[in-house]
């Protein structure tokens, strides 16, 4: 074998060796690629610090709208509930709180809201949802700054909450701009409702009630007292003149129990208050059954001390329903219940023969129909009419009594 032949053999061996090396390298690359696919990507769709709570699509929408500069990634520490960039999303993490108590401090405001957020389950993590508070003592309002956008939105559910005897008004700041893809409405939790918070914002819905024809001198508490005689309120707003602060004579409300809507409309529409007659109906135009509720024949009348006593039209019955007289708590005590029952019977017998009296009492863990109402059955319709004229507007336990005629058949079936 000549030199040239040996050289060609060596060249072929080197080529085969390089081919095997390249093949092994490609195999290792493929194995490495397959293994790497099992790990989550460190680069795709990873939100910048401070924006972990939103999806990539929401982040892109915010960039497109100019709310996040395309090249800016805020350098903020990551926490369980991220604190988003202060300049970029600060307006979405702030709430205006009006009608604050005189002399309340910023520390007290923060402590109160932090406690409430954890108490009703609106806090998303341990620690303080409220980071800062600024109070304007001259104008009686404050601004709260929260650690996350979502907790800020949820805190709006506290609109109307009571702090030191003051009903707080919670709103978005004037410079607030809704963020694309992020909900702007708080999810009302049962714990918030059961805490007795009555929001001052009544959202548009088929169950929103309009109450017109109110005497201008009636204040929030007096109007609420009338409405609460039918059930718990979710939201209430007495519309006032911005310059004078006086009532414009109309209000809006919504009940916690939506089934009360028709009942309250039936009971309040046409009620005479002094020289005015209430107009009560669903606020939504074209709502189903709104006209039927307005045309109901159930009769209700109210007499406030100092106002003339005018009976509304409608067929009376021999059963009288008394509202706004007792509370479920008062009825739980056996001795107090017996005293109330005896007082009512004794007073009602002054106007006629009383056949029976029913006062539904609360039962633990059971929703008792008509709990808090008093039903009195008279021997005749005439006796019932006399009792209604005498008892309506009277004070019982410092509450103004509201009366209405009740269907005798429902009474005997105990459909309260």
Swiss-Prot record:
SUPFAM superfamilies in alphabetical order: RNA-binding domain, RBD
Keywords: mRNA processing, mRNA splicing, Nucleus, Repeat, RNA-binding
Keyword Repeat belongs to the record: yes
Boundaries of every RRM domain copy: 93-175, 207-285, 318-408
MF annotations from Gene Ontology: mRNA binding; poly-pyrimidine tract binding; pre-mRNA 3'-splice site binding; RNA binding
Record's GO cellular component terms: commitment complex; nuclear speck; nucleoplasm; nucleus; precatalytic spliceosome; spliceosomal complex; U2-type prespliceosome; U2AF complex
Biased composition (Basic residues): 11-21, 29-40
Region of interest (Disordered), residue spans: 1-47
Database matches in Pfam families: RRM_1 (PF00076)
Keyword Nucleus: yes
Gene Ontology terms describing biological process: mRNA splicing, via spliceosome; nuclear export; positive regulation of RNA export from nucleus; regulation of alternative mRNA splicing, via spliceosome; RNA splicing; spliceosomal complex assembly
Assembly mode: Forms a heterodimer with the U2AF small subunit.
Family indicated by similarity: Belongs to the splicing factor SR family.
Physiological role: Necessary for the splicing of pre-mRNA. Binds to the polypyrimidine tract of introns early during spliceosome assembly.
NCBIfam families, sorted: U2AF_lg
Identification of the protein by name: Splicing factor U2AF 50 kDa subunit
Organism of provenance: Drosophila melanogaster
Source taxonomy: Eukaryota, Metazoa, Ecdysozoa, Arthropoda, Hexapoda
Protein encoded by which gene: U2af50
């Amino acid at each position: 074998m000549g030199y040239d032949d040996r050289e060609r053999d060596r060249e072929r061996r080197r080529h085969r060796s390089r081919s095997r090396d390249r093949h092994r390298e490609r195999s290792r690359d493929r194995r490495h690629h397959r293994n790497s696919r099992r790990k989550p990507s460190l680069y795709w769709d990873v939100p910048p610090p401070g924006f972990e709570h939103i999806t990539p699509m929401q982040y892109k929408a915010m960039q497109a709208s100019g709310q996040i500069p395309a090249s800016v990634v805020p350098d903020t520490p990551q926490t369980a509930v991220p604190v988003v960039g202060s300049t970029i999303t600060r307006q979405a993490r702030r709430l205006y709180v009006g009608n604050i108590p005189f002399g309340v401090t910023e520390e007290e405001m923060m402590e109160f809201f932090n406690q409430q957020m954890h108490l009703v389950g609106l806090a998303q993590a341990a620690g303080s949802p409220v980071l800062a508070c600024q109070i304007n003592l001259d104008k009686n309002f404050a601004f709260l700054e929260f650690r996350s956008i979502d907790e800020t939105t949820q805190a709006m559910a506290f609109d109307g909450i009571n702090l030191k005897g003051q009903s707080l008004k919670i709103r978005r700041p004037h410079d607030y701009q809704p963020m694309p893809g992020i909900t702007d409405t708080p999810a009302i939790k049962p714990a918030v409702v059961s805490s007795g918070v009555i929001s001052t914002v009544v959202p548009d819905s088929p169950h929103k009630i309009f109450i017109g024809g109110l005497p201008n001198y009636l204040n929030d508490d007096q109007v609420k007292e009338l409405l609460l005689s039918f059930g718990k309120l979710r939201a209430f707003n007495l519309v006032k003149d911005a310059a004078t602060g006086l009532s414009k004579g109309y209000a809006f409300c919504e009940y916690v129990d939506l089934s009360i809507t028709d009942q309250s409309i039936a009971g309040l529409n046409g009620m005479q208050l002094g020289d005015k007659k209430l107009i009560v109906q669903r606020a939504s135009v074209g709502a189903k059954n709104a006209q039927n509720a307005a045309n109901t024949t159930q009769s209700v009348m109210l007499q406030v001390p100092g106002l003339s006593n005018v009976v509304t039209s409608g067929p009376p019955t021999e059963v009288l329903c008394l509202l706004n007289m007792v509370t479920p708590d008062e009825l739980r005590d056996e001795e107090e219940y017996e005293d109330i029952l005896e007082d009512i019977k004794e007073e009602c017998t002054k106007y006629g023969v009383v056949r029976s009296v029913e006062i539904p009492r609360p039962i633990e863990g059971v929703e008792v129909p008509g709990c808090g109402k008093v039903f009195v059955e008279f021997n005749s319709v005439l006796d019932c009419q006399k009792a209604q004229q005498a008892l309506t507007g009277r004070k019982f336990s410092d509450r103004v009594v509201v009366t209405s005629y009740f269907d005798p058949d429902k009474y005997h079936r105990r459909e309260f």
